[in-house]
């Protein structure tokens, strides 16, 4: 039985040699040089991220007020129509009601389109922030000759000096202090005012 096992090992070794000589050596792996970064903290705490969030909040608040004013106007129109229901002929009432419904539908459609445009503008601005942050991270990795960048969320324990998050935030604040939300002109009147 041992002879068969030894013959099998020799056969495997001969087969390996026939495919390229001696068994391949494992490639030399350089010792790890690790840096750790918290991208979520960067996207939350950097000046540019705070600036984008402030712009988003201001524009959303302003637009919400405009929509609320328009909704109040529509409610007043609807109440007036209900009061006139008994006075107006059925045809006139139905025409006014259709006009009211079209105004209501237009407002609803406009609100949805504007919210989508505003969300897209926010996403575009934050993508620019994230891409700039990733470039800074790559630059820091090159400066420190790091061959492994790990997100802080994946780390349970770290030695002091490996986390570069604050350095990335500092460089991002210098390189990209603000990004304007680029909301299309037709997306909503109040959204385009900074």
Regions found by a protein language model. Name each.
Residues 10, 14-24:
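C-terminal segment of classical bacterial N-terminal signal peptides
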Residues 173-176:
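Acidic/polar surface patches and capping/hinge elements
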Residues 159:
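Catalytic domains of cell-wall/extracellular-matrix polysaccharide-remodeling enzymes
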Residues 3-10:
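Sec-dependent signal peptide recognition
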């Amino acid at each position: 039985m041992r002879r068969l096992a030894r013959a099998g090992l020799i056969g495997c070794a001969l087969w390996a040699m026939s495919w390229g000589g001696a068994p391949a050596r494992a490639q030399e792996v350089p010792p790890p040089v690790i840096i750790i970064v918290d991208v979520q903290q960067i996207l939350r705490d950097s000046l540019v991220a705070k600036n984008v969030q402030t712009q988003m909040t201001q524009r959303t608040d302003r637009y919400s007020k405009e929509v609320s004013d328009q909704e109040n106007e529509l409610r007043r129109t609807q109440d007036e129509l209900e009061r006139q229901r008994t006075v107006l002929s059925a045809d006139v009432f139905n025409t006014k009601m259709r006009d009211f419904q079209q105004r209501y539908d237009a407002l609803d459609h406009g609100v949805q389109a504007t919210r989508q445009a505003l969300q897209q503008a926010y996403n575009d601005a934050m993508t620019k922030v994230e891409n700039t942050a990733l470039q800074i991270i790559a630059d820091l990795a090159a400066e420190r000759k790091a061959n492994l960048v790990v997100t802080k969320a994946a780390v349970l324990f770290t030695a002091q000096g490996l986390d570069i998050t604050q350095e990335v935030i500092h460089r991002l604040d210098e390189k990209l202090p603000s990004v304007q939300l680029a909301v299309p002109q037709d997306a909503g009147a109040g959204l385009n005012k900074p």
